[in-house]
Amino acid sequence: MKRTFIMVLDSFGIGASADAKKFGDEGADTLGHIAEACARGEANVGRSGPLTLPNLSRLGLGKAAEESTGTFPVGLDKNADIIGAYGYASELSSGKDTPSGHWEIAGVPVLFDWGYFSDVENSFPQELLDKLVKRANLPGYLGNCHSSGTVILDQLGEEHMKTGKPIFYTSADSVFQIACHEETFGLDRLYELCEIAREELTDGGYNIGRVIARPFIGDKPGHFQRTGNRHDLAVEPPAPTMLKKLVDEKGGEVVSIGKIADIYAQVGITQKVKATGLDALFDATIEEMKKAGDNTIVFTNFVDFDSSYGHRRDVAGYAAALELFDRRLPELMALVKEDDILILTADHGCDPTWPGTDHTREHIPVLVYGPKVKPGSLGHRETFADIGQTVAAYFGLSPMDYGKNML
């Protein structure tokens, strides 16, 4: 029975890639800088002391990071008994965003340039805004700028509730984000507005990767909170991913947990499981792993590392989340049967010690575990697509156009 379990620790980079300078990210190192901050006693909120990741260390995380940067992450166990195959991968895709990273993991790198709204103020074209106001019958809009999602809620959340004007904002990523209050504006209405925005962006040739619905609750600044009802409207990958090939060629199952289905625009996904928060994502993953049959991929995105800690530049929160993940990891590993493969990886970096609030261009860890996986170094992988090619070969699918089989 062949099953693969892919766990994406969203934004968990392990050192700047060779082309990081182009992105303003030379020297970024999500894992390394978190570990250093912990060792200096600068991440003692909700946790304390050096970064402790014994289970990830046994899978080779520390060694992969050392291969990536030349430095072993401080606090991790150098003498851990390695039980998995480990390496680090560079990104071939042109961007450092979520869809690019995930599509490349599935064997389809993004070799074109996304469209971006690069103006920090008055970010969106007036023609686009006018169409959204007219088609969605809006009283106007707020924002129209670059912002962090939590910051803009405190700035504009109250005005939004009073006026009914949605909050439009973007970032360095190829995104159009819309924040609305779940109760005063309504969740279904927000989703409808996002559908309209997706249509207008596509029809207008803007080449924007995602429209993201950002529902929130609360009644005043400091109390506004984003809910788990986020919804991403992505464009479809430009070629068949290994997910789609598994479904098409083997009649296989691909179970999406968290935001995976949205990232792939639902293509190549046979089942969606919604879960919010690290523990809930873990619980859902465990349930689906227990049920998974032959020719199945269970694919989970642990978004909190990125959304709650990376973008918010919360070092202690990121460290605590990693330690929680590590504590629960044996529960997943215990469900890996004789022919199964468990892959732990990331989609980009988001160094919480780095200036700004955006992603960082980094290598990702590639940790592979299973009874038939030979422990040891996989070295430097030249593209995330090596993961997709490896999974395609494992299931006996037609080869992907990019990537090499690692096993």
From Swiss-Prot:
- Which cofactor(s) are needed, names only? Mn(2+)
Where is the major localization of this protein? cytoplasm
What are its GO biological-process terms?
A: 2-deoxyribose 1-phosphate catabolic process; 5-phosphoribose 1-diphosphate biosynthetic process; metabolic compound salvage; nucleotide metabolic process
Enzyme Commission identifier(s) = 5.4.2.7
Please name the Pfam families in this protein's record: Metalloenzyme
* InterPro entries in the record: Alkaline_phosphatase_core_sf (IPR017850), DeoB (IPR010045), Metalloenzyme (IPR006124), Phosphopentomutase_DeoB_cap_sf (IPR024052)
Cofactor binding note from Swiss-Prot or TrEMBL: Binds 2 manganese ions.
Keyword annotations for this protein, in alphabetical order, are:
Cytoplasm, Isomerase, Manganese, Metal-binding
Q: Which reactions are catalysed by this chain?
A: 2-deoxy-alpha-D-ribose 1-phosphate = 2-deoxy-D-ribose 5-phosphate; alpha-D-ribose 1-phosphate = D-ribose 5-phosphate
Q: Where does Mn(2+) 2 bind?
A: D306, H311, H359
What the entry lists under PANTHER family is as follows: PHOSPHOPENTOMUTASE
Q: What does this protein do?
A: Isomerase that catalyzes the conversion of deoxy-ribose 1-phosphate (dRib-1-P) and ribose 1-phosphate (Rib-1-P) to deoxy-ribose 5-phosphate (dRib-5-P) and ribose 5-phosphate (Rib-5-P), respectively.
Q: What is this protein called?
A: Phosphopentomutase
Q: Which organism is it from?
A: Yersinia pseudotuberculosis serotype O:1b (strain IP 31758)
Lineage of origin = Bacteria, Pseudomonadati, Pseudomonadota, Gammaproteobacteria, Enterobacterales
